[in-house]
């Protein structure tokens, strides 16, 4: 069985993330969406709220499971779930340069893992959780 994890803070999980997930489920038997804390980003809303949001968006997906990662490395989660693949999304060349560092880190910690990159569809590339949080903040 081909198993992958799709890790992220998903704060919030938006249509760009959903676009990548829809592509991933076509290739993998099982995809775990791993909702994690990000020490470099705000933790509001809490992990449970983020999971609830994602569940509402993926309720019709049969081969997707959501798990919370409170304090483990992505590669540790992959090993625990017997996942051989990590899913990542790319929107731009800047993302690619950023992701090379993650790739190197993943491979140094778990040499057998493969990182699979999906390019966001054109109409989803401008979406950013950081921008969406900022818009929501200033709407108040």
From Swiss-Prot:
Pathway: Cofactor biosynthesis; coenzyme A biosynthesis; CoA from (R)-pantothenate: step 4/5. ATP binds at residues 9-10, 17, 89-91, 99, 124-130. Substrate binds at residues 9, 41, 74, 88. The keyword Magnesium applies. It holds the Pfam family CTP_transf_like. Its cofactor is Mg(2+). It catalyses: (R)-4'-phosphopantetheine + ATP + H(+) = 3'-dephospho-CoA + diphosphate. One of its GO terms (cellular component) is cytoplasm. The keyword Nucleotide-binding applies. The record marks 17 as: Transition state stabilizer. Its EC number is 2.7.7.3. InterPro entries: Cyt_trans-like, PPAT, Rossmann-like_a/b/a_fold. Signal peptide: none annotated. SUPFAM superfamilies: Nucleotidylyl transferase (SSF52374). GO terms for molecular function: ATP binding; pantetheine-phosphate adenylyltransferase activity. HAMAP family: PPAT_bact. Reversibly transfers an adenylyl group from ATP to 4'-phosphopantetheine, yielding dephospho-CoA (dPCoA) and pyrophosphate. Homohexamer. This is Phosphopantetheine adenylyltransferase. The lineage of its organism: Bacteria, Bacillati, Mycoplasmatota, Mollicutes, Mycoplasmataceae.
């Amino acid at each position: 069985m081909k198993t992958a994890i799709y890790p992220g803070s998903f704060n919030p999980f938006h249509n760009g993330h959903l676009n990548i997930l829809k592509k991933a489920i076509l290739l993998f038997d099982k995809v775990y969406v791993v909702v994690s804390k990000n020490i470099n980003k705000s933790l509001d809303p809490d992990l449970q709220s983020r999971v609830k949001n994602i569940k509402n968006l993926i309720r019709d997906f049969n081969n997707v499971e959501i798990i919370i990662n409170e304090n483990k490395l992505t590669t540790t989660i992959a090993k625990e779930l017997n996942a051989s693949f990590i899913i990542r999304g790319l929107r731009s060349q800047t993302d690619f340069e950023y992701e090379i560092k993650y790739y190197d880190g993943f491979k140094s910690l778990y040499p057998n893992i493969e990182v699979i990159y999906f390019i966001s569809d054109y109409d989803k590339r401008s979406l950013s959780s950081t921008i969406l949080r900022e818009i929501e903040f200033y709407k108040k």
